Amino acid sequence: MADAIDDIVDVVVSTAPDVRDGLTGRRVYEADENPSGERQLEADVYADELLEARLLDVDAVGSYASEERESVIEADEGGRYHVAADPLDGSSNLKSNNTMGTLFGVYEEPLPAAGDALVAAGYVLYGPITTLITARDGTVTESVIDEDGTRTVVTDDLTLPSDPVVYGFGGRVPNWTPAFADYVESVASELKLRYGGAMIGDVNQVLTYGGVFGYPGLEDRPEGKLRLLFEGHPIAAIVEAAGGASSDGDGSLLKKEPEQLHERTPLFVGNDEYIERLEAALP
């Protein structure tokens, strides 16, 4: 299993410089929307097509699914693992030249799969430098990806700081439920606001400084915005492996199994104390 997972991660790593280099000139919208009803940038489609072609070329990969596609794409030869990806998380930040990333989860069951079928997860963060966070076998590792696609481990056992510093929550404030708004008010009196509009960037702040990030169920969208398979499970696996917690407001995201490929979920991750307080605050 180890070699096969390494092969999958290596493809994501080697693709990262191509995704980053390809952002220039792809800041305009396509005519189409993705399956979640969001407008697609040319950069979304470009990153998705690169990952699909390269991951399905790995012998161990049996299928590929992404936030940008309606259905699962099967490999010609059935491999053991199934990859779910958000090829360009935070792509709406491209116009303003802010943080984006590539998020992926490796499952050992056909998609859509339950959180306990996830065997590895990770994300590439396109910031001032390009970094990779991976979670596997209960350990989180941080690496730097160079322009030629090589990676160098900089932290081999990343854990959440025990003294939380930052918080960030998505969704329009007028659409927050009263219970969630009250919770945020208490958090805001203790932590510093850090919210950049790309989940990967905001979660990376939490991993670096400790704290809490979430995108809640809203008054007009109780199911939330983020996708369980493409975003919820992988981010939950990373934060939990780093010693934190995840929740949909009721329990760990890794205990949830989507019935549909693009199923949405409220999402909260961070230090245990803030996730416990969140679950106690929500009805």
Swiss-Prot record:
Binding site for Mg(2+) 2: 86, 89, 231
Cofactor: record remark: Binds 2 magnesium ions per subunit.
One Pfam family in the UniProt entry: FBPase_C
Entry's Gene Ontology cellular component terms: cytoplasm
NCBIfam families: PRK09293.3-2, PRK09293.3-3
EC number: 3.1.3.11
BP terms from Gene Ontology: fructose 1,6-bisphosphate metabolic process; fructose 6-phosphate metabolic process; fructose metabolic process; gluconeogenesis; sucrose biosynthetic process
Catalytic activity: beta-D-fructose 1,6-bisphosphate + H2O = beta-D-fructose 6-phosphate + phosphate
Residues binding substrate, per UniProt: 89-92, 195, 225
Organism, scientific name: Natronomonas pharaonis (strain ATCC 35678 / DSM 2160 / CIP 103997 / JCM 8858 / NBRC 14720 / NCIMB 2260 / Gabara)
Subunit description: Homotetramer.
Major location category of this protein: cytoplasm
Positions contributing to Mg(2+) 1 binding: 67, 86, 88
InterPro entries: FBPase_C_dom, FBPase_class-1, FBPase_N, FBPtase, Fructose_bisphosphatase_AS
Protein known as: Fructose-1,6-bisphosphatase class 1
One example GO MF annotation: magnesium ion binding
Keywords, comma-separated and alphabetical: Carbohydrate metabolism, Cytoplasm, Hydrolase, Magnesium, Metal-binding
PROSITE patterns the UniProt entry points to: FBPASE
Classification lineage: Archaea, Methanobacteriati, Methanobacteriota, Stenosarchaea group, Halobacteria
Cofactor: Mg(2+)
Pathway it works in: Carbohydrate biosynthesis; gluconeogenesis
Subcellular localization, as worded in the UniProt entry: Cytoplasm
Family under the similarity heading: Belongs to the FBPase class 1 family.
PANTHER family the UniProt entry points to: FRUCTOSE-1,6-BISPHOSPHATASE-RELATED, SEDOHEPTULOSE-1,7-BISPHOSPHATASE, CHLOROPLASTIC
EC class name: hydrolase
